[in-house]
């Protein structure tokens, strides 16, 4: 055997070894690419590049009334949102906080993400968690008559609303913010101050998400005297712009009721709003604009209205706000006295 043939044999051996190394390397590369794809899955983009935020649930758009009183609050909200500050709307139940927050959020022409706070909400509910499993199956037939099989099962991270909003530059509407326990909301501190969201439970570089420059937040809360309200920690409140709201003026409430209740006479609308505003002053329970809307809806079903029917409707609307059955009798007495004492009440 010549030296050249030996060299060819050696060269052939090297080629076969190199080919196996290349196959193994390609297999590793495919696996690494697939793992990278999974790491990047939380960007939540569809194939055509549109955001999956478009598919997120947000409350159905409701009629919104623009009066001078409403516009003044809107202007104040936009002032702070324009400079990147989160806005915290605080006020009694039924004064229109949520409707205002959703309207201003939609007007920004950015995606809107909705969170509804409650005592059971956790940090994971806000940011996400490893909530799914994904299996990767690989079949390598590169070498003739040789099949390599490999299955990889790994946890898959699923983003929740806050993370989606931060990534996409959406407007976050966090309704009933103060009903969530303060410890769950700690994650907001770095979002509002450092512009970084930390994902507890994530690993490696994926643990931190830079806040999109278009991200904004609007939070709503009932006043602290309401049951079930947790007082947020001072460090977080220090980073929020607080706007305290009360019930709108009579003219605005009339327009709101008219917008929500079709086929209801204008004069009747004015009278039911007047009645509810009077009850608001006399009763210990909260009588919001929503109560006036509900009462007007009930009145649209009545052909021959009398004082007894009007009393029934008002008591039905407000009875869920009293603590026990015995309080309903006192409520009815107050409603009857108020109706009797008002001139020009619906008749």
UniProtKB/Swiss-Prot annotation:
Its main location: other. GO terms for biological process: gas vesicle organization. GO terms for cellular component: cytoplasm; gas vesicle. Signal peptide: none annotated. Residues 1-50 are annotated as: Disordered. GO terms for molecular function: ATP binding; ATP hydrolysis activity. Keywords: ATP-binding, Cytoplasm, Gas vesicle, Hydrolase, Nucleotide-binding. Its EC number is 3.6.4.-. SUPFAM superfamilies: P-loop containing nucleoside triphosphate hydrolases. The keyword Transmembrane does not apply. It is found in: Gas vesicle; Cytoplasm. Pfam families: AAA_5. Residues 18-42 have a biased composition (Basic and acidic residues). Induction: Expressed from a single promoter upstream of gvpA; most transcripts stop at the gvpA terminator, with low read-through into downstream gvpC-gvpN-gvpO. Expression starts in early stationary phase and is maximal in stationary phase. Highly expressed in 25% salt, poorly expressed in 15% salt, no gas vesicles are formed at 15% salt. The keyword ATP-binding applies. Gene3D superfamilies: P-loop containing nucleotide triphosphate hydrolases (3.40.50.300). It catalyses: ATP + H2O = ADP + phosphate + H(+). ATP binds at residues 91-98. Forms homodimers, a GvpN-GvpO heterodimer, interacts with GvpC and GvpL, might interact with GvpA. Belongs to the CbbQ/NirQ/NorQ/GpvN family. An ATPase that functions in gas vesicle formation. A minor component of the gas vesicle, also found in soluble extracts. Gas vesicles are hollow, gas filled proteinaceous nanostructures found in some microorganisms. They allow positioning of halobacteria at the optimal depth for growth in the poorly aerated, shallow brine pools of their habitat. Expression of a 9.5 kb mc-vac DNA fragment containing 2 divergently transcribed regions (gvpD-gvpE-gvpF-gvpG-gvpH-gvpI-gvpJ-gvpK-gvpL-gvpM and gvpA-gvpC-gvpN-gvpO) allows H.volcanii to produce gas vesicles. Encoded in a 14-gene locus called mc-vac. This is Gas vesicle ATPase GvpN. The gene is gvpN.
């Amino acid at each position: 055997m010549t030296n050249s043939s030996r060299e060819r044999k050696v060269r052939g051996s090297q080629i076969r070894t190199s080919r196996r190394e290349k196959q193994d390397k390609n297999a590793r590369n495919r696996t690494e690419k697939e793992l990278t794809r999974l790491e990047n899955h939380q960007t939540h983009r569809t194939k055509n590049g549109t955001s999956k935020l478009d598919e997120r649930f947000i409350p159905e758009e409701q009629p919104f009334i623009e009066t001078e009183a409403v516009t003044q609050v809107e202007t104040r909200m936009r002032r702070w949102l324009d400079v990147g500050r989160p806005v915290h709307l605080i006020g009694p139940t039924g004064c229109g906080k949520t409707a205002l927050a959703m309207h201003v959020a939609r007007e920004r022409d950015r995606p809107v993400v909705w969170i509804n706070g409650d005592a059971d909400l956790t940090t994971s509910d806000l940011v996400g968690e490893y909530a799914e499993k994904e299996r990767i199956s690989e079949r390598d037939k590169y070498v003739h008559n040789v099949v390599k099989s490999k299955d990889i099962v790994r946890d898959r991270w699923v983003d929740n609303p806050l993370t989606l909003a931060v990534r996409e530059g959406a407007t976050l509407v966090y309704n009933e913010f103060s009903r969530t326990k303060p410890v769950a909301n700690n994650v907001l501190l770095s979002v509002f101050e450092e512009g970084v969201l930390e994902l507890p439970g994530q690993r490696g570089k994926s643990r931190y998400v830079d806040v999109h420059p278009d991200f904004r937040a609007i939070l709503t809360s009932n006043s602290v005297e309401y049951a079930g309200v947790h007082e947020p920690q001072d460090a977080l409140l220090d980073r929020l712009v607080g706007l305290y709201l009360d019930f709108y003026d009579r003219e605005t409430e009339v327009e709101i009721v008219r917008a929500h209740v079709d086929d209801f006479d204008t004069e009747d609308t004015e009278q039911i709003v007047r009645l509810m505003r009077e009850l608001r002053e006399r009763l210990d329970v909260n009588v919001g604009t929503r109560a006036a809307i509900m009462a007007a809806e009930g009145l649209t079903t009545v052909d021959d209205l009398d004082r007894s029917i009007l009393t029934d409707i008002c008591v039905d609307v407000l009875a869920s706000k009293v603590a026990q059955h015995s309080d309903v009798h006192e409520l009815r007495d107050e409603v009857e006295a108020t109706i009797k004492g008002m001139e020009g009440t619906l008749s």
